[in-house]
C-alpha cells in the first residue's frame, strides 16, 4: 500500500510526502510518483502524530471522579478501591473510549500502564493506534504478591506476540512506595533479558521524597541508583523532585523522563518540573497527559500548552520552553523515549501523521 500526500503545509512550505509500507519514503515538492492512494493536502498542515508518553487509558471511566484531593488520599480512598471493582469489559470499553479521544486530538501512539493488559491490548488492536502497554507490578512489600506479579509478567511478555506489531509490551512497576527493592531488581533483570522497557512513577511529590529518605535512606533517584536499575530501558513518569546531581545521574544512565503538567497541577504535586535543565543535561524529555481522573482529558495539545506556560511562569521567563521544544517533546522525544523511529516527517520514519484542516469553520453562536 502506497500513499501520496500532495500539497500539504509542512513548516510553512507546500510539500508532498510519499509513503510506502507505512514508512515515509520521500519528502519534497511536486513529487512525480505513482501511489495507490492520493490525499489532497491543500489548506492542511502536516504534522507528526503526537506520542502520549504516559497515561492510564481506561481511566476515562474515572473522569471527574475523586476531584480536589492530594495524590495519596486520591489513590488510597478513591482510585485503588474502585479499580479493584473493574471488570475486563470495563477496561476494554474504557480503553476504546480513550483511543477515540486520542485519535480525535491527533495522538497516534501512547504509553499505557494499567491493569488487565489483554483487555487494553484488544481495544487498541481494534482502534488502530500504536501502543506500548506496561504490565503493572505491585507487591506492597509482600513476597507472595511479588511472585504473583512475576508470573503474570512472564505470561504477558509471551502473550503480546499474539497482537500486531503496533502493540508492544513493557513492564510497569507502579512506584517505589508500592514495589519492593527486590521486585524492582528482578524487573530490571527481566526487562534486560527480554529487551523491553520499564515504566515507573518517580519523584512525583514532596511526600514521596521525604518517605523515600525515611524508608530507604535515599531520595527516589538515588535509591534506584543504589539498586542498580537506572538504565536506558527506564522511563520515569513525573520526576518533579530531582536535584542537579540526580539530573546528571539520569542523563548518564540514559533514563527518559515524561512530564505530565495537567495531573501535576490538578493533584498539586508540584509545578517546578526541570524541563530546560534536563534537556540541557541530555535527558530525553517526553510529554504525557496522565490518566483522565488526574488530568480530565487525553489532549496532547492542551498538555503542550500547560507544560510551556507552567515552565515560563515558575521561572518568570517568557522565553523558556518555546513552542518548538515542547512540540518536539510531544512528538519526536516521545517516540525516542519508547523506542520508535517516529515523530518526524523525514525519510525512513514511520508515517504516523496528522493533517490539520486550516479551513475549519467555527459557529460563533455555539460559543456565546
Where on the chain are the PLM-derived regions?
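Histidine-centered catalytic micro-motifs
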Residues: 49-60, 197-206
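Active-site gating loops and adjacent loop-to-helix segments of metal-dependent hydrolytic enzymes
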Residues: 61-93, 127-142, 147, 206-231, ...
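Alpha-helical scaffold segments that flank or form the walls of functional sites
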Residues: 63-128, 150-163
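Metal-coordinating catalytic core of metallo-dependent amide/deamination hydrolases
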Residues: 120-239
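Short acidic/histidine-rich active-site segments
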Residues: 198-206, 268-270, 277-303, 345-353
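Histidine/acidic-residue-rich catalytic or RNA/ligand-binding cores of hydrolases
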Residues: 206-218, 246-251, 268-278, 295-312
Amino acid at each position: 500500500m502506497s500513499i501520496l500526500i500532495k500539497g500539504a503545509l509542512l513548516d510553512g512550505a507546500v510539500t508532498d510526502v510519499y509513503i510506502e509500507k507505512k514508512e515515509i519514503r520521500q519528502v519534497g515538492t511536486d513529487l512525480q510518483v505513482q501511489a495507490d492512494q492520493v490525499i489532497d493536502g491543500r489548506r492542511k498542515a502536516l504534522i507528526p502524530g503526537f506520542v502520549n508518553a504516559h497515561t492510564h487509558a481506561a481511566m476515562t471511566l474515572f473522569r471527574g471522579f475523586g476531584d480536589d484531593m492530594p495524590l495519596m488520599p486520591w489513590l488510597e480512598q478513591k482510585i485503588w478501591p474502585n479499580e479493584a471493582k473493574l471488570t475486563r469489559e470495563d477496561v476494554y470499553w474504557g480503553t476504546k473510549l480513550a483511543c477515540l479521544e486520542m485519535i480525535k486530538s491527533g495522538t497516534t501512539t501512547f504509553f499505557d500502564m494499567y491493569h488487565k493488559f489483554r483487555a487494553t491490548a484488544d481495544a487498541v488492536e481494534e482502534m488502530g493506534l500504536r501502543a506500548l502497554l506496561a504490565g503493572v507490578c505491585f507487591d506492597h512489600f509482600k513476597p507472595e504478591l511479588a511472585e504473583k506479579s512475576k508470573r503474570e509478567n512472564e505470561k504477558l511478555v509471551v502473550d503480546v506476540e499474539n497482537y500486531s506489531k503496533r502493540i508492544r509490551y513493557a513492564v510497569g512497576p507502579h512506584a517505589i512506595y508500592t514495589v519492593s527493592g527486590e521486585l524492582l531488581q528482578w524487573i530490571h533483570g527481566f526487562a534486560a533479558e527480554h529487551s523491553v522497557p520499564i515504566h515507573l512513577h518517580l519523584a512525583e511529590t514532596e511526600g514521596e521524597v521525604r518517605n523515600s529518605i525515611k524508608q530507604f535512606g535515599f531520595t527516589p533517584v538515588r535509591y534506584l541508583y543504589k539498586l542498580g536499575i537506572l538504565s536506558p530501558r527506564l522511563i520515569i513518569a513525573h520526576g518533579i523532585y530531582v536535584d542537579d546531581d540526580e539530573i546528571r545521574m539520569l542523563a548518564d544512565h540514559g533514563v527518559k523522563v515524561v512530564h505530565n503538567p495537567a495531573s501535576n497541577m490538578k493533584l498539586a504535586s508540584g509545578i517546578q518540573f526541570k524541563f530546560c535543565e534536563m534537556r540541557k543535561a541530555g535527558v530525553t524529555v517526553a510529554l504525557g497527559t496522565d490518566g483522565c481522573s488526574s488530568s480530565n482529558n487525553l489532549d496532547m495539545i492542551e498538555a503542550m500548552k500547560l507544560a510551556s506556560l507552567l515552565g515560563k511562569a515558575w521561572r518568570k521567563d517568557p522565553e523558556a520552553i518555546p513552542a518548538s521544544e515542547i512540540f518536539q517533546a510531544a512528538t519526536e522525544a516521545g517516540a525516542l523515549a519508547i523506542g520508535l523511529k517516529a515523530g518526524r516527517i523525514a525519510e525512513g520514519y514511520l508515517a504516523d501523521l496528522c493533517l490539520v484542516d486550516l479551513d475549519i469553520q467555527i459557529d460563533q453562536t455555539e460559543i456565546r
